[in-house]
């Protein structure tokens, strides 16, 4: 969901990832190359590994990261600044950025991502994973992550 947001703020130690790419291709991964470049997007898509909040900022996936304890306060400060700008100006400012993204081909990228998602939904691997999910969500997700030792199967400190 964060991939499609205008602004993203995370905790330094956040764990951001998309493990579902190990078993099926999700629709919102089409934003990854636009946000963090081809190589970082490719690594996340091919491994399903997570990145920290600090890495998310350095990759361009998030705007800023803060200590977990101060995250809410810092985001509220930013929201208060955003709220001081008249809404009609904010609408134009957002439109200006979105128009530039469209000029750079993002609309075609979204369309291509949607086509890839349609193909992926009919792949053998996705169909098998959907059957596993229908049989038991926790078991299917644990099976997906077990081989990698992360997400659901990661050892807790």
What are these regions (language model features)?
Residues 1-90:
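Crotonase-fold acyl-CoA enzyme core
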Residues 52-53, 84-157:
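C-terminal alpha-helix plus adjacent terminal tail
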């Amino acid at each position: 969901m964060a991939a499609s947001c205008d602004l993203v703020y995370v905790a330094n130690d956040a764990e951001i990832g998309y493990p579902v790419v190990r078993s099926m291709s999700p629709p919102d991964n089409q934003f990854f190359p636009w946000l963090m470049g081809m190589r970082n997007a490719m690594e996340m898509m091919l491994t399903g590994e997570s990145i920290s909040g600090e890495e998310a900022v350095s990759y361009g996936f998030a705007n800023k990261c803060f200590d977990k304890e101060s995250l809410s306060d810092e985001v509220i400060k930013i929201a208060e600044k955003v709220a001081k700008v008249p809404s009609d100006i904010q609408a134009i400012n957002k439109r200006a950025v979105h128009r530039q993204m469209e000029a750079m081909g993002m609309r075609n990228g979204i369309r291509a991502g949607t086509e890839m998602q349609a193909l992926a939904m009919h792949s053998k691997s996705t169909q098998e994973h959907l059957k596993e999910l229908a049989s038991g969500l926790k078991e299917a997700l644990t099976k997906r992550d077990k081989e990698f030792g992360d997400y659901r199967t990661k050892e807790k400190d």
